Amino acid sequence: MGNGLSDQTSILSSLPSFQSFHIVILGLDCAGKTTVLYRLQFNEFVNTVPTKGFNTEKIKVTLGNSKTVTFHFWDVGGQEKLRPLWKSYTRCTDGIVFVVDSVDVERMEEAKTELHKITRISENQGVPVLIVANKQDLRNSLSLSEIEKLLAMGELSSSTPWHLQPTCAIIGDGLKEGLEKLHDMIIKRRKMLRQQKKKR
């Protein structure tokens, strides 16, 4: 699921085998942001407590094409009082990972509001967004099409590339696939920005 980014290109093959990307992990409190971060770092479940400020980790990931990239993740607390700080972390970011709890139907409207708010900030125009639909292993989780509708993904700016990825952060299902999609979107954006600079 996404807006026109499903085509497979050979962009990755022309890149150096080592790259670093600044990624911000956002989402409501209790969505599973920190669980996502430490599952990626340690490849195991780490019991976490609510994030009061932020966690930051540099994590090397080998993508499907055997290229190793470093993601510098900033996992920012999702409590309401911390959300005004989100824009400070997204300044100059390469990509945003927005984690939603696939079971928490009652807070999906709140998640939608925050997602649209952060993507509409001028500095974030065009920044790729990976929406992580977490807790997909639970029986009462919403389907991807339901989440896409509730988050009003079709109403995001046409300049904002996005991908909705089903995951289970506790066991790691879907996380690497999501990162590969995010990486693809970032590379496409960088290439587009370079082409725009050449035309000036």
Curated annotation (Swiss-Prot):
GO biological process terms on file? brown fat cell differentiation; intracellular protein transport; vesicle-mediated transport
**Gene that encodes it:** Arl4a
Gene3D superfamilies named among the record's database cross-references: P-loop containing nucleotide triphosphate hydrolases
- Origin organism is Rattus norvegicus
GO cellular component terms given for this protein: cytoplasm; nucleolus; nucleus; plasma membrane
After translation, the protein is modified as follows:
Myristoylated.
A Pfam family hit: Arf
**Origin superkingdom:** Eukaryota
Keywords for this entry?
Answer: Cell membrane, Cytoplasm, GTP-binding, Lipoprotein, Membrane, Myristate, Nucleotide-binding, Nucleus
The answer on whether this UniProt entry bears the keyword NADP reads no
Q: What is known about its subunit structure?
A: Interacts with CYTH2. Interacts with KPNA2; the interaction is direct. Does not interact with ARL4A.
Name of the featured protein: ADP-ribosylation factor-like protein 4A
Query: What family is it from?
Result: Belongs to the small GTPase superfamily. Arf family.
- Functional summary from the UniProt entry: Small GTP-binding protein which cycles between an inactive GDP-bound and an active GTP-bound form, and the rate of cycling is regulated by guanine nucleotide exchange factors (GEF) and GTPase-activating proteins (GAP). GTP-binding protein that does not act as an allosteric activator of the cholera toxin catalytic subunit. Recruits CYTH1, CYTH2, CYTH3 and CYTH4 to the plasma membrane in GDP-bound form.
* The keyword GTP-binding is annotated on this UniProt entry: yes
Matching InterPro entries = P-loop_NTPase, Small_GTP-bd, Small_GTPase_ARF, Small_GTPase_ARF/SAR
Listed binding positions for GTP are 27-34, 75-79, 134-137
> Its Gene Ontology molecular function terms?
GTP binding; GTPase activity
